[in-house]
Swiss-Prot record:
<feature type="disulfide bond">
    <location>
        <begin position="23"/>
        <end position="88"/>
    </location>
</feature>
<feature type="region of interest" description="Variable (V) domain, involved in antigen recognition">
    <location>
        <begin position="1"/>
        <end position="108"/>
    </location>
</feature>
<dbReference type="InterPro" id="IPR036179">
    <property type="entry name" value="Ig-like_dom_sf"/>
</dbReference>
<comment type="function">
    <text>Immunoglobulins, also known as antibodies, are membrane-bound or secreted glycoproteins produced by B lymphocytes. In the recognition phase of humoral immunity, the membrane-bound immunoglobulins serve as receptors which, upon binding of a specific antigen, trigger the clonal expansion and differentiation of B lymphocytes into immunoglobulins-secreting plasma cells. Secreted immunoglobulins mediate the effector phase of humoral immunity, which results in the elimination of bound antigens.</text>
</comment>
<dbReference type="GO" id="GO:0019814">
    <property type="term" value="C:immunoglobulin complex"/>
</dbReference>
<dbReference type="InterPro" id="IPR050150">
    <property type="entry name" value="IgV_Light_Chain"/>
</dbReference>
<protein>
    <recommendedName>
        <fullName>Immunoglobulin kappa light chain</fullName>
    </recommendedName>
</protein>
<feature type="region of interest" description="Constant (C) domain">
    <location>
        <begin position="109"/>
        <end position="214"/>
    </location>
</feature>
<keyword id="KW-0677">Repeat</keyword>
<feature type="disulfide bond">
    <location>
        <begin position="134"/>
        <end position="194"/>
    </location>
</feature>
<dbReference type="InterPro" id="IPR003597">
    <property type="entry name" value="Ig_C1-set"/>
</dbReference>
<dbReference type="InterPro" id="IPR003599">
    <property type="entry name" value="Ig_sub"/>
</dbReference>
<keyword id="KW-0472">Membrane</keyword>
<feature type="domain" description="Ig-like 1">
    <location>
        <begin position="2"/>
        <end position="99"/>
    </location>
</feature>
<keyword id="KW-0391">Immunity</keyword>
<feature type="domain" description="Ig-like 2">
    <location>
        <begin position="113"/>
        <end position="210"/>
    </location>
</feature>
<keyword id="KW-0964">Secreted</keyword>
Amino acid sequence: DIQMTQSPSTLSASVGDRVTITCRASQSINTWLAWYQQKPGKAPKLLMYKASSLESGVPSRFIGSGSGTEFTLTISSLQPDDFATYYCQQYNSDSKMFGQGTKVEVKGTVAAPSVFIFPPSDEQLKSGTASVVCLLNNFYPREAKVQWKVDNALQSGNSQESVTEQDSKDSTYSLSSTLTLSKADYEKHKVYACEVTHQGLSSPVTKSFNRGEC
């Protein structure tokens, strides 16, 4: 199969900026390349085909170029409607592989997260499961690291993260990390803590609670 590699994976920009996304094919695909734009909850929209041909109705600020193995999509002057995820797709072979996507996000100012920790509810514990939630609110940029510690022992493999779409008003993100344990495991330990590292924090922030005291 022909593999498609896009870069960068995220691009932070402001309205009016000129931005360029690169797509590389693992072998020559001539000009059999399409570009798509996708917004959350919507189907992908075709922007460009045959590497540089604009789909009908697509604004001329979108410019495609390249052939063989290297291609670019340039937006000459970024508009508010252009903040979305962009994908390249080769259609030289039957596999019609897509690139992994490039998210064009609003360039914000660095903002540290507000961090909260929530123990499992009594209702949930009755069902035999315990979920501890660490919530990070209103931060930028999107990269944030959450580490769970139970009685000071680092946890791995038993938590899941979910990040919101970028807030249209203040350009920030929010994130929830959920540590899931059995009720029996939960009741074997006392101190539950989440440690958060982010560019906006001069040092990691830890929020914790003692089981049975909250």
